[in-house]
């Protein structure tokens, strides 16, 4: 074989390997996306079971304004449900108390200090 032929074969092989790598990466990304969608659907289903409609509505409004707080409260509620600590559905008043507790626990305290010269 001549050098140009070898170079052509090498390039062809490299292109084929790159194509396979890209396909496998795309497949992994798609699988991760599907897995996240399934997990999110399971979270929503669990929250539907443990929250009253009014509480779900309030949590949705909180999610619009403060997504991190809503996520923390959802995690807390799901943890309570999974450990069997919830005996009945959480109503709006109970959710308000939980929101306040989690908000107070995660609130950052800011202090402004002035340095005098």
Swiss-Prot record:
Pfam families: dsDNA_bind. Signal peptide: none annotated. NCBIfam families: PRK04239.1. One of its GO terms (cellular component) is cytosol. The keyword DNA-binding applies. Coiled coil: none annotated. One of its GO terms (molecular function) is DNA binding. This is DNA-binding protein MK1619. HAMAP family: dsDNA_bind. Belongs to the PDCD5 family. InterPro entries: DNA_bind_arc, PDCD5-like, PDCD5-like_sf. Disulfide bonds: none annotated. It comes from Methanopyrus kandleri (strain AV19 / DSM 6324 / JCM 9639 / NBRC 100938). Keywords: DNA-binding.
């Amino acid at each position: 074989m001549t050098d140009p032929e070898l170079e052509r074969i090498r390039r062809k092989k490299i292109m084929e390997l790159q194509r396979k790598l890209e396909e496998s990466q795309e497949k992994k990304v798609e699988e991760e996306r599907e897995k996240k969608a399934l997990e999110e659907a399971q979270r929503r289903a669990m929250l539907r079971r443990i929250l009253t409609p009014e509480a779900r509505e309030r949590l949705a409004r909180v999610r619009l304004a403060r997504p991190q707080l809503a996520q923390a409260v959802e995690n807390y509620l799901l943890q309570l449900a999974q450990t069997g600590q919830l005996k009945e559905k959480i109503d709006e008043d109970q959710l308000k108390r939980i929101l306040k507790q989690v908000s107070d626990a995660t609130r950052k305290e800011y202090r402004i200090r002035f340095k005098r010269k």
